[in-house]
Amino acid sequence: RLRHIYLKNKSKWSKKYLIMLYQSLNYSSKPENFREAVIKGISPDKGLYYPNKIKPLSKNFINNLSKFHIHEIAFEAINQFIGNSIPELKLRSIIEDTLNFDFPLIKIEKQIFSLELFHGPTLAFKDVGARFMARCLEFFNKNSNERITVLVATSGDTGAAVANGFFNISGIDVVILYPKGKISKIQEKQMTTLGGNISALEVDGVFDDCQEMVKKAFLDPQLISKRKLTSANSINIARWLPQMFYFFDGYIKANKFNLPINFSVPSGNFGNLCAGLIAHKLGLPINHFLACTNINDTVPRYLNSGIYKPNPTIKTISNAMDVGNPSNFIRIQKVYNNDFNKLKKNISGYSFNDRETKNCIKNIYQNSNYIMDPHGAIGLSLIHI
């Protein structure tokens, strides 16, 4: 029923983008359309895919966001990135299936709010990207006799969201790699108990080891000749780009207070923050971004020094953000065409240790009667430590 309403009252600013090409950020492979970039996951030259061109949305549309349902806003935001790879009706259906839960904006204290992204089926913000990608891949593979294998590395919530999003999707197998002893018991059960087309493998190492194994698999000619591989990490554009939906949603809810809006983003592999930057590039008038990490502080150090020097991963209580060498940061640099001054103008970086994280959780509960998990607390530790 909603689909018919949208067709009847469709935004007058909607355009049909015939093609969107994605270039490798290593610049040694030919550009691909959305479909091929999603299926391949990573470019043959080992680079991450990035859209060749991003056209800002109409100012009239941006100024009238509050008049539209989130499904319509999501369609307008993602449409140009899909191009002609998915028909409009199908894309709208995918968006409806993806965004079937809310993102409440909860007041913590004056001018400080929590955008709750844990109301999806696995209680992880990655439910949005995983569900969107699963439905895109299902559409792309529906007339094929060849099965697709989705290979994913996880530090916790990605694996659970991907397992749930892809469970029983026809023609697709999922293999999840997770570091031994470094994810929660609940997340481990979410990944290992579904069965069916979902396989979860424990790796004796850290998340960066799992991620490196995934990257090597994509570059193994013998393996890819036998299996059609793709990834469901945020290196995949269909997992990464839909995350901008809730930046639009959060902005609309916060904008009623008529104050500049800053997003403090707890960050690990930096796909979420990068999606927010794409929303900003589309015209969403976000004032500033705060990139907040645990003691795996590669990006905050870079923002302070201009030197990008990854360190080995360190285990923390915010385990899903234990990433020493975040893959998506190269995309963030591309957003600003590798201009450090522009990047630093829009993003500030901060890191917090476990003690500061625990203090934040304690203080927020005592002052506001609000319970935060260690990951969300990283985003507020700048204020409450």
Model-found features: residue ranges?
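Well-ordered mid-protein domain cores that form the structural environment of catalytic cofactors
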Residues: S114-N168
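Active-site/ligand-binding loops adjacent to catalytic centers
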Residues: Q187-I235, R239, A291-I378
